[in-house]
Each structure stands twice: as structure tokens, then as C-alpha cells.
């Protein structure tokens, strides 16, 4: 489903901002996630220890270009990530607005085109804009990662109708909600809408109990997916009686 990989879990988890490496490891294991995102900014003085932890966890690593604001920065970071982690996967972020951390659509498409042409399998962090989505697919991306809300905001699905339109328009394209999810109920809602996965970080890393929150999100994402698969009833403006009137007592 995600390029050459079909995960059992639809929960993708970030690795930044945890209280300790031990809690990070416990949260990843509790989440059941098979894909974890990693920033090259972690590769400082303790980079070796962090890579050792990644090896121990035996998860699929999705490096990202977090913090990049230009095409050159993002492309250079992607090449470094491919060399360091020995993977063609890259979560492409090209930030265009400092306050909202909204992606720069023009730089994002250009960077995606360059990387896809060189064999990368790009996971683009984008918005719910349909035209931008089309341009990213034309550039060579095989999936899209629209935000639910600004990164780390915890606002959930801020533009539900826009996301519904995106899901409806890109029927056969894997769509992963990336950013803005703050509560398990929000993740379940996205899965009920038909999205293919949830990527989050802050909601688990900053929770009072990251282990418990990782478990809660795993359950919610699974429940939302199962509900969608089972077939949700249509919403109605008026009540519809669920109890049949046949056989009711007749009073005279």
C-alpha cells in the first residue's frame, strides 16, 4: 500500500520529543507501528546511540526533511537520509510559513519532482488542496500525506469537508493524515472517513503517559478502520425508527 510495503498497522509514529529513549522505545512497541519517522536533526552527538535503538526496534524507518524551507535544503537532506538509513523512502517537508508550518506548495512539487526522478519514494507532507495533490502525483509521488491541522496543534481535522473531498477525489491513492492530530477520537474519525493511515508524534510524545497514549491511538486507529470496513450507516437529518411497528399492541 505504501510503495513496496503493506503494513499490518496503519499507525505511523514520530520519534521526536520523548522524555527519554526508554520511553520512546516503550511507546513505539505499545503503538504496534511498523513505520517510524526520523529526523536527521537527531543525528548529533548522540546519533550513534539513536541509530542503535532503531536497529534494535527493527522497524521500517521513514526519514523526513523536517525544518527545511527551500528545495535545496530538502533535496540535500533527502540525499543524506538515503545514505545514512539506506532507504529510498523520504517524508518530504518543505515549510513555507513559520507560524503555521504550512508547506510551500511550489517548492514541495519541485523537490518531489527532483527526488522521484532520482528513485526516491516520496511521502509528501501537503495540504488538502486537490490541485496540489494532482501536481504531486504528476511529479511521481504514489501517495499523499495531507495535514489535519498545523503540526503539533492538536486541533484534529480542521477542514473536514476539504478532507472528505480529497478522499473522494483520490479514490485509489493512499492518503495518510499527517500533523494536527491531538486525540485518539480524531484519529478514529479520520479512519472512518476512509483515510489509509495516521502519522503523529506530539500527541504521544508530550502526553503525561506516552505508553498509554500510544496504546490508545493504536486502538482508535484500528477501531476507525474496522468501522469503515464494516460499513457505517448514512447520516440523516431526521429520526428513523429502529423498532418495527408490526405487532404493536392495539388499544381501543
Swiss-Prot record:
Q: Which family does it belong to?
A: Belongs to the ThiG family.
So what does this thing catalyse?
Answer: [ThiS sulfur-carrier protein]-C-terminal-Gly-aminoethanethioate + 2-iminoacetate + 1-deoxy-D-xylulose 5-phosphate = [ThiS sulfur-carrier protein]-C-terminal Gly-Gly + 2-[(2R,5Z)-2-carboxy-4-methylthiazol-5(2H)-ylidene]ethyl phosphate + 2 H2O + H(+)
Q: What is this protein called?
A: Thiazole synthase
Give the E.C. number(s).
Answer: 2.8.1.10
Report the subcellular localization: Cytoplasm
* GO biological processes: thiamine diphosphate biosynthetic process
Give TM regions: none
Active-site positions, per UniProt?
A: 91
Recorded GO molecular functions are:
thiazole synthase activity
Binding-site residues for 1-deoxy-D-xylulose 5-phosphate, renumbered to this chain? 152, 179-180, 201-202
Q: How does it assemble?
A: Homotetramer. Forms heterodimers with either ThiH or ThiS.
**Which species?**
Erwinia amylovora
* Gene giving rise to this polypeptide: thiG
Keywords attached to this entry: Cytoplasm, Plasmid, Schiff base, Thiamine biosynthesis, Transferase
**Which Pfam families does its entry note?**
ThiG (PF05690)
Function in brief? Catalyzes the rearrangement of 1-deoxy-D-xylulose 5-phosphate (DXP) to produce the thiazole phosphate moiety of thiamine. Sulfur is provided by the thiocarboxylate moiety of the carrier protein ThiS. In vitro, sulfur can be provided by H(2)S.
Part of which pathway?
Cofactor biosynthesis; thiamine diphosphate biosynthesis
HAMAP family hit by this protein: ThiG (MF_00443)
A GO cellular component term found in this entry reads: cytoplasm
Q: Which InterPro entries does the entry link to?
A: Aldolase_TIM, Thiazole_synthase_ThiG, ThiG
Amino acid at each position: 500500500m505504501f510503495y513496496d510495503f503493506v503494513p499490518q498497522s496503519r499507525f505511523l509514529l514520530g520519534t521526536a520529543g520523548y522524555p527519554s529513549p526508554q520511553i520512546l522505545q516503550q511507546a513505539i512497541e505499545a503503538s504496534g507501528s511498523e513505520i517510524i519517522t526520523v529526523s536527521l536533526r537527531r543525528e548529533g552527538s548522540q546519533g550513534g546511540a539513536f541509530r542503535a535503538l532503531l536497529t534494535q526496534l527493527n522497524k521500517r524507518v521513514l526519514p523526513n526533511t523536517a525544518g527545511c524551507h527551500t528545495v535545496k535544503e530538502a533535496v540535500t537532506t533527502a540525499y543524506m537520509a538515503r545514505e545514512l538509513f539506506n532507504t529510498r523512502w523520504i517524508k518530504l517537508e518543505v515549510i513555507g510559513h513559520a507560524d503555521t508550518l504550512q508547506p510551500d506548495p511550489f517548492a514541495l512539487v519541485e523537490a518531489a519532482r527532483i527526488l522521484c526522478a532520482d528513485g526516491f519514494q516520496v511521502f509528501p507532507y501537503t495540504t488538502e488542496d486537490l490541485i496540489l495533490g494532482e501536481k504531486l502525483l504528476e511529479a511521481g509521488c504514489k501517495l499523499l500525506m495531507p495535514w489535519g491541522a498545523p503540526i503539533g496543534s492538536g486541533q484534529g481535522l480542521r477542514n473536514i469537508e476539504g478532507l472528505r473531498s480529497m478522499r473522494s477525489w483520490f479514490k485509489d491513492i493512499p492518503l495518510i493524515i499527517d500533523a494536527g492530530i491531538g486525540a485518539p477520537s480524531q484519529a478514529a474519525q479520520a479512519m472512518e472517513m476512509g483515510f489509509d493511515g495516521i502519522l503523529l508524534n506530539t500527541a504521544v510524545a508530550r502526553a503525561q503517559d506516552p505508553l498509554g497514549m500510544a496504546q490508545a491511538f493504536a486502538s482508535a486507529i484500528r477501531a476507525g478502520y474496522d468501522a469503515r470496513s464494516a460499513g457505517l450507516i448514512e447520516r440523516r437529518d431526521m429520526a428513523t425508527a429502529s423498532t418495527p411497528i408490526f405487532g404493536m399492541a392495539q388499544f381501543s
